[in-house]
Swiss-Prot record:
It comes from Neisseria meningitidis serogroup B (strain ATCC BAA-335 / MC58). Involved in the phospholipid modification of the capsular polysaccharide, a strong requirement for its translocation to the cell surface. This is Capsule polysaccharide modification protein LipB. Keywords: Cell inner membrane, Cell membrane, Membrane, Polysaccharide transport, Sugar transport, Transport. GO terms for cellular component: plasma membrane. It is a peripheral membrane protein. Disulfide bonds: none annotated.
Length: 419
């Protein structure tokens, strides 16, 4: 009997629906390129625009593009009627926790339309994510080892192969975001009742991004020196704690800590009380948060209250994460994709929030107090099966803000770059 081969979710989306509705995408023109690909493959693509930033990257002159400028409370009924009238079979968005997308998921489910969410890549760099019914901790995939071990024989690619590199990083995203927000705030009257998922003020972003550039230059030499010390073993035995963006949905929705700051202080308190005296802890600031928030004062205040930690807490900014992953004892995270990077390096990872990869056999399941003394690495066979499942099914080679490789119509094994 021939073994069923699992397909990538982009192919599954393509084969499961004829009439597809796109909601908000990532900043930039990725959804316009996605629509071109879907249309070239015989699909009818509809699009909702919610603000002038959406209009800029996905012009309302495109076929089947609808401007929704009514108030938020009117959206459920509007969407319900549109899905019914146009026989929508799939609803696609970027990020499943945005206000309009939360409603869209419910309405889609009530109307037997599938709901698909794009997200930044689970395995980075060079990947983006597409899942049915939800992403991150809302992913419907089982949190069971046996599921991924059972699926492994069905994968077309069972050995890891490096993806095609694409241009990424902060710069292309920032360029798209700046243009998006300029357009969003330039013409607010067209969408007077629009509710944004982030701070609705252009100055809120431009000033921190400018500060971010200055801080990166300021920390450049220091970060190089820290990286050299790590490689030389100057920090001895250490744990790495990668912080997440302060207002990220991963923090707001998928964990019980009220803030990244509260998570940081909780970890430091546990480390001070339970970690062996000969271990250190490295706190890594998130690069996207560089201009928005700084935790150095909190760390210094904590060390002052816990003098036994003097010289044992290191705060870094732009040192590449792999530098720490090659030498650290383990990682503590809320639910960052950095956890997956740690697991790739066979590093023990302790998750304190809700994460799609927090699975017995992959992450450490003991308490944080126990983790400092007995960190448990992932089961290699299980994690390989887990990783390869995602690379085959949920991950797509590319970057939202520069280039994505879409499969051709005739075969899912070949791909076409879309820039």
């Amino acid at each position: 009997m021939k073994q069923t081969v699992l397909k990538n979710n982009l192919q599954n989306l393509l084969e499961s629906a004829e009439n597809i509705l796109l909601l908000q995408g990532p900043v930039g023109d990725f959804f316009l390129r996605l629509a071109d690909w879907l249309t070239a493959n015989g699909k009818t693509v509809h699009k909702f625009n919610f603000n002038a930033g959406d209009d800029y990257f996905y012009p309302p002159t495109q076929a089947h593009t609808v401007v929704f400028n009514d108030n938020y409370d009117a959206f459920p009924e509007f969407l319900q009627e549109y899905i019914t009238q146009h026989h929508i079979q799939a609803v696609v968005c970027f990020g499943d926790t945005r206000p309009y997308h939360v409603i869209a998921k419910r309405i889609a489910n009530e109307n037997q339309a599938s709901f698909w969410a794009f997200e930044e890549g689970y395995f980075r760099p060079y990947y983006i994510t597409l899942e049915k019914d939800g992403v991150n901790a809302f992913s419907p995939l089982p949190r069971r080892a046996d599921f991924f071990l059972e699926q492994f024989p069905k994968l077309a690619q069972q050995e890891y192969k490096a993806p095609t590199p694409v241009h990424g990083g902060f710069t292309p995203m920032a360029k798209n975001a700046i243009r998006y927000y300029i357009e969003l705030f330039r013409n607010p009257r067209k969408y007077p009742d629009y509710i944004h998922h982030r701070a609705p003020n252009a100055g809120h972003y431009l000033k921190p991004w400018s500060l971010s550039i200055l801080k990166r230059l300021n920390y450049y030499i220091e970060d190089i020196q820290i990286a050299k010390r790590v490689e030389a073993g100057k920090y001895g035995k250490f744990f790495i704690v990668p912080l997440q963006v302060f207002n990220d949905s991963q923090v707001r929705i998928h964990c019980d800590f009220p803030s990244v700051r509260s998570f940081l202080l909780h970890v430091l308190s546990s480390f001070a009380e339970h970690a062996p005296a000969d271990t250190n802890i490295i706190i890594k600031h998130h690069p996207m948060d560089r201009g928005f928030i700084d935790y150095w004062r909190d760390i210094k205040r904590f060390i002052k209250e816990h003098p036994e930690l003097k010289g044992r807490v290191i705060y870094v900014h732009d040192v590449p994460l792999p530098v720490f992953l090659r030498h650290g004892l383990g990682m503590v995270t809320i639910n960052s994709t950095s956890g997956l990077s740690g697991l790739i390096h066979n590093m023990p990872v302790k998750v304190l929030g809700r994460a799609y990869y927090d699975i017995p056999g992959i992450t450490d399941q003991n308490t944080l107090a126990e983790f400092w003394n007995h960190p448990t690495p992932p089961d290699k066979e299980l994690f390989h099966a887990y990783r390869m499942y995602h690379l085959n099914v949920t991950q797509i080679n590319g970057n939202f803000y520069s280039q994505v490789f879409f499969p051709n119509k005739k075969t899912s094994n070949s791909s076409t770059p879309v820039i």
